[in-house]
Curated annotation (Swiss-Prot):
Stretches the record annotates as Disordered: 1-91, 253-280
CC terms in the record's Gene Ontology section: cytoplasm
Tissues and organs where the protein is expressed, per its UniProt entry: Widely expressed, highest levels in cerebellum, brain cortex, hippocampus, pons, putamen and amygdala. Highly expressed in neurons, but also present in glial cells. Slightly higher expression in the dorsolateral prefrontal cortex of schizophrenic patients compared to control individuals.
Low complexity bias spans: 74-86
Upper classification of the organism: Eukaryota, Metazoa, Chordata, Craniata, Vertebrata
Disulphide-bonded residues: none
Subcellular location, record wording: Cytoplasm
Residues carrying Phosphoserine: 279
Stated name of the protein: Uncharacterized protein KIAA0513
Length: 411
């Protein structure tokens, strides 16, 4: 017995006459009404089984029950995604609001932080996604525009909060926020009374940031002409000379440098002789005590993995910030790579020197900070040697930085 041919239109229109099925085909598991909807007795699980069975038996996927099921599933998935994204947005907003308020409370110097706030701060900072640590570092950095000199209460709140975040950064290998906090350690300070030293140690300067900056200032003055020559007359030479220490020179031109200039302008006979660690004037007004002096023991400072990662990030940011081809729209990075192919040899040499100068300046800053945190000279030299090779520094640049480490280590 031959099976009658079924017009194609019947399959598409689903007319009242269903195509004759093969004797081997099993009947549909769920009967349908004339309008294509499922019977009243069908459950949700039966709906899923029906859709799967019909699809396996080769029926058209445009079947009404399949379309309804697919639309329902798609709507549920879209609704679920929207709900998840909405929840995540709310959590992110709550985290940012908390960190903003927490940092503002630290710098206000007013009411103390209660235990609930401290516990919530610790919870946010220990999260695996690192958002709490990131936003804390951002808001602390943003406070620099107000003042770098803080009250004693604010200072010790910062010490406690930094210790929590830096410990979690070390545990999670989260080096981005730690790099920003490292910079803040040399930014915020309070004026405190100097500690009286034993008579035998009064000849030796205290290990404050001022002593480090004095030493670096002296070293910088001696080597400025050499460093200027090393910058090799690139198009950005003036800019590089101005900041060839990647921010160190800015520190040197701060209040300490201005104070030194004022001292130099005074008559010679009125200048006090520096025979003790602190002059009477310094004892009256106190000295600058920076955050790093209380955070030297943080384990993250004592691993080269942090310094290597932080240095790479700092060099990348500096190149992006100071390179005319990448300043502005981030989409110009690809255009820069395309331009490289069309550069003359002289332009390529200038570009390479520009990158070398950035590496040289950042290495000066990083080795200075490493020594200030109490890292030994060998570790600093190992770091310098590795990064000098990667950055393609020449022998004279390498010797300048090695001499800098040697001089700072003896202070």
């Amino acid at each position: 017995m031959e099976t009658p041919e079924v017009p194609v239109g019947s399959l598409i229109d689903f007319g009242p006459e269903a195509p004759t099925s093969s004797p081997l085909e099993a009947p549909p598991p769920v009967l349908q009404d004339g309008d294509g909807s499922l019977g009243d007795g069908a459950s949700e699980s039966e709906t899923t089984e029906s859709a799967d069975s019909e699809n396996d038996m080769g029926e058209s996927p445009s079947h009404p029950s399949w379309d309804q099921d697919r639309r329902s599933s798609s709507n549920e998935s879209f609704s679920s995604n929207q709900s998840t994204e909405s929840t995540q947005d709310e959590e992110t907003l709550a985290l940012r609001d908390f960190m903003r308020g927490y940092v503002e409370k630290i710098f206000s110097g007013g009411e103390d932080l209660d235990q609930e706030e401290k516990a919530k701060f610790g919870e946010y900072c220990s999260s695996e996604n690192g958002k709490g640590r990131e936003w804390f570092a951002r808001y602390v950095s943003a406070q620099r525009c107000n003042s770098k000199c803080v009250s004693e209460a604010t200072f010790y709140r910062l010490v406690q909060s930094f210790a929590v975040v830096l410990f979690e950064c070390h545990q999670m290998d989260d080096f981005g926020p730690a790099k920003n906090l490292m910079t803040m350690c040399f930014t915020y300070y309070h004026i405190g009374k100097p500690q009286l030293l034993p008579p035998e140690s009064r000849e030796k300067p205290a290990g404050s940031i001022d002593s480090y900056l004095k030493s670096a200032n002296s070293w910088l003055a001696e080597k400025k002409d050499i460093a200027e020559r090393l910058l090799k007359n690139t198009s950005a030479r003036t800019e590089n000379v101005k900041g060839f220490f990647g921010g160190l020179e800015t520190k040197l031109k701060g209040p300490l440098a201005r104070r030194n200039e004022e001292d130099e302008n005074k008559p010679q006979e009125k200048r006090p002789r520096a025979v003790t660690a602190y002059s009477p004037e310094d004892e009256k007004k106190g000295e600058k005590i920076y955050l790093y002096t209380h955070l030297k023991q943080q384990p993250i400072w004592h691993t080269l993995r942090f310094w290597n990662a932080a240095f790479f990030d700092a060099v990348h940011c500096e190149r992006t910030k100071r390179s005319p081809t990448t300043r502005g729209d981030a989409g110009e990075e690809e255009e820069k790579r395309e331009k490289w192919c069309h550069m003359t040899q002289e332009e390529r040499d200038d570009s390479l020197r520009f990158n070398e100068n950035i590496t040289f300046g950042q290495l000066g800053t990083f080795t200075h900070n490493m020594l200030a945190f109490g890292l030994n000279k060998k570790l600093c030299n190992d770091f310098l040697k590795k990064q000098a090779v990667i950055g393609n520094l020449d022998e004279e640049q390498y010797k300048l930085l090695s001499d800098h480490i040697e001089q700072m280590a003896t202070e």
